[in-house]
A protein has these predicted regions:
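Glycine-rich phosphate/adenosyl-contacting loop at the front of the ribokinase-like
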Residues: 2-92, 113-116, 133-136, 288-290, ...
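Hydrophobic faces of well-ordered beta-strands that scaffold small-molecule active sites
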Residues: 181-183, 211
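A short helix->loop->beta-strand "cap" motif at the edges of active sites that frequently abuts
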Residues: 173-180, 255-259
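Conserved phosphate/ATP/ADP-binding segment of small-molecule kinases
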Residues: 191-283
Length: 362
């Protein structure tokens, strides 16, 4: 049964989606090798916001990605990767040596975990084209013209002040132009401190409609922080329904502009086996998804697949329980796909997982 979706601002026509961030070169030693022992690396591309644009494009959403990459073979190859997956890249900037002197594409190294050994990421993103380009030159009124939904994350502003100022400007402009805004805090301890992330991301909340994750934010006053036991920074790591409902309500009381909050909860059994479920606050109620247990081929991008799954479900006016279950199923499927992004192009495969249908498709 269809219902009026408050997130779509009364517009149930096909939506145009845009996201902004850094697309990176990903280098991974093959066969679960450790980086210090590797003699070769597999090359691919990724990045949180790019992953979401790509996942939505593969599911048929009109999806655009904006970034700055160097005008060289690496930058052009990253753009080609996006375009080959139906992501519109027209607004992307291929910078010159004069505009970005280091002329670098951001890079990260992934050491894939196995069994009890966790995966490890090493970033090499300083002086990348996105961080060096003068982002004040970007005309956001022109960039956002014709779009309905903007997605941002807390990763890009962690890169430097240039990016942090730009993302705040994006948030303000998007709200002025009436776009739906989603935001994922996506804390990365290797890029900035918890305190820096919390101060910045809390500034973003008044502009957000759909929030992914519940950290890092100034959620509690010092005298009411309930952290204890398996809680960290005022957030329960593996919450009960009642705990999560209380946390969500605390967000809504402070930020009534939020129309939806969603977080996934991971249970780590080993480096190669996890369980996953999610909670979502929507239209005054907290919903809890099914719990999935699965083996992992590639964990990177699981959170991005969750976000893209929920955005897709919202854009297609799913019922609340179907929205959160579709999001979790999208994330679970991503764990079975090598690379950063969820390249699933068959919505029925995600729905089948929602219904626990594992039959061979012929």
């Amino acid at each position: 049964m269809e219902h009026s979706n408050p997130i779509l601002m009364g517009n149930n026509s096909p939506q145009k989606f845009i996201t902004i961030g850094e697309v990176m070169l990903r280098l991974t030693p093959p066969n679960y090798e450790k980086i210090r022992m590797a003699s070769a690396f597999e090359a691919s591309y990724g990045g949180s916001e790019a992953n979401i644009a790509l996942a939505l494009a593969n599911l048929g959403v009109d999806s655009t990605f904006f970034s700055v990459v160097p005008n060289n073979s690496l930058g052009k190859s990253a753009v080609r990767w996006l375009r080959c997956n139906d992501v519109h890249c027209t607004p992307m900037i291929l910078s010159t040596k004069e505009e970005t002197p280091s002329h670098r594409l951001g890079t990260y190294y992934l050491e894939t975990g196995y069994g009890i050994r966790p995966s490890k990421v090493i970033y090499d993103r300083m002086h990348s084209a996105l961080t060096e380009y003068d982002l004040t030159k970007v005309d956001l009124d022109e960039l956002f013209d014709g779009f309905d939904w903007l997605h941002l994350s807390g990763i890009t502003p962690a890169l430097n002040k240039n990016c942090a100022d730009f993302i705040l400007r994006c948030l303000r402009t998007a709200k002025e132009k009436g776009l739906t805004v989603s935001f994922d805090g996506n804390f990365r301890s290797t890029l900035w401190s918890w305190e820096e992330a919390r101060d910045y991301c809390t500034q973003c909340l008044p502009y957000v409609d759909v929030l992914f994750g519940i950290e890092p934010y100034h959620l509690w006053k010092d005298d009411e922080d309930p952290s204890k036991g398996d809680w960290k920074d005022g957030v329960p790591l593996q919450p009960s329904y009642e705990q999560q409902d209380e946390i969500f309500q605390h967000f809504i009381d402070r930020y009534p502009n939020l129309k939806c909050i969603a977080r996934h909860v991971r249970y780590v059994h080993s480096g190669s086996e996890n369980s996953l479920k999610a909670f979502m606050w929507y239209e005054g109620h907290t919903f809890e998804s099914k719990l999935y247990t699965f083996n992992i081929l590639d964990r990177v991008g699981g959170g991005d697949a969750f976000a893209s799954g929920l955005i897709y479900a919202m854009l297609h006016d799913y019922k609340a329980m179907d929205m959160i279950n579709f999001a979790v199923a999208s994330s679970v499927i991503k764990h079975t796909i090598h690379g950063d992004a969820n390249i699933t192009d068959d919505v029925s495969s995600i729905r089948n997982l929602m219904n626990m249908n594992y039959d061979i498709k012929r």
